[in-house]
UniProtKB/Swiss-Prot annotation:
PPIases accelerate the folding of proteins. It catalyzes the cis-trans isomerization of proline imid ic peptide bonds in oligopeptides. Thought to function as a catalyst in the folding and modification of cuticle collagens. Residues 216-274, 288-313 are annotated as: Disordered. Residues 9-174 form the PPIase cyclophilin-type domain. The lineage of its organism: Eukaryota, Metazoa, Ecdysozoa, Nematoda, Chromadorea. Pfam families: Pro_isomerase. Belongs to the cyclophilin-type PPIase family. Its EC number is 5.2.1.8. This is Peptidyl-prolyl cis-trans isomerase 9. The gene is cyn-9. Keywords: Isomerase, Rotamase. It comes from the Eukaryota.
């Protein structure tokens, strides 16, 4: 039920024995003035009519007319026989637009004595009533308790269509949507703590990005470590024979020797050669380049004090 939707109820009794509740949804958009009149008469919030002639309330009112396969009628709060009635706006109030039609049973409509003579009397259809279109304002529909309407429709009546048994509305009012109870401070604190725990579970330890592949690397590392641990456990197990262990040790020693031989390669000058390719040397190589010899520095010879002598290689 939305916040704008209005619902009312009529508790029915047959010969002072409750037979059920009729719940009605009001069409406040199509007939707001008529709906407000009916709602206020259900709650009795307006009080007494002018001159204290009657209380403006459906509680205790009788269903004074039943026409089988047509309608059940009530709401005469002043006389109780269909000759009276009083609205919250005065004796009568005008018709609203005849938007809705009497096209099906269980529709709520206003009873009147002619145009613009609406008061407190109403009727509920028990079958389609197209002859009422344009004369009576439809403003609601029974949504629960239709079986109660069917019981009333099948009652025995006299020559004036009045039920032989006494049918009375022993209670009426408005249905209000129940609000959720406010939570205590302890419940609110527990709810906040639960939200924090759920938030911690949802947030990963390391934030992800579209370039981040740490999860895949961790999985591959974990799988490789697991596989290596399995190999080690198998190698340490006593079920492995001696020949297998001996061959494995020989292969590992051979691998170490090959790695040592590659690392010990050096050129003619004792410089270690790096890389995996073959070692190549130039066939012609002077110890001292020509341009170095031409620019060699001069040096004084022992016993000579006049001219320096060029240093020859």
């Amino acid at each position: 039920m939305s916040s704008l939707e209005k619902r009312v109820f009529l508790d029915m009794a047959l010969d002072e024995k409750p037979i059920g509740r009729i719940e009605i949804k009001l069409f406040t958009s199509e007939a707001p003035k008529t709906c407000e009149n009916f709602r206020a008469l259900c709650t009795g919030e307006v009080g007494m009519a002018p001159n204290n002639k009657a209380r403006l309330h459906y509680k205790g009112n009788e269903i004074h007319r039943v026409v089988k396969k047509f309608m059940i009628q009530g709401g005469d709060i002043t006389d109780g026989d269909g000759r009276g009635g009083f609205s919250i706006y005065g004796r009568y109030f005008d018709d609203e637009k005849f938007v809705l039609k009497h096209s099906k049973p269980y529709l709520l409509s206003m009873a009147n004595k002619g145009p613009n003579s609406n008061s407190s009397q109403f009727f509920i259809t028990t079958a389609p009533a197209p002859h009422c279109n344009g004369k009576h304002v439809v403003f609601g529909e029974v949504i629960k308790g239709r079986e109660v309407v069917d019981v009333l429709d099948n009652l025995e009546v006299d020559g004036k269509s009045k039920p032989i048994a006494k049918v009375r509305i022993f209670n009426s009012g408005e249905l209000v949507k129940k609000k959720k109870p406010s939570k205590t401070k302890e419940e609110l604190a527990a709810l906040e703590e639960r939200k924090r725990q759920e938030a911690k579970k949802d947030i990963p330890d390391i934030p992800k990005s579209w370039l981040y592949r740490d999860n895949e690397e961790r999985e591959s590392d974990f799988s490789s470590k697991t596989e290596s641990s399995r190999v080690r456990s198998r190698s340490k197990s006593p079920s492995n024979n001696y020949e297998t262990r001996r061959g494995h040790m020989a292969n590992s020693r051979g691998d170490r020797n090959r790695r040592t031989q590659r690392a010990d390669r050096k050129d003619d000058f004792g410089i270690a050669v790096r890389g995996r390719g073959g070692v190549q040397f130039r066939r012609v190589r002077y110890v001292t380049p020509e341009h170095w010899r031409r620019n060699a520095p001069s040096k004084w010879q022992q016993g000579s004090y006049t001219h320096p002598v060029d240093l020859q290689p």
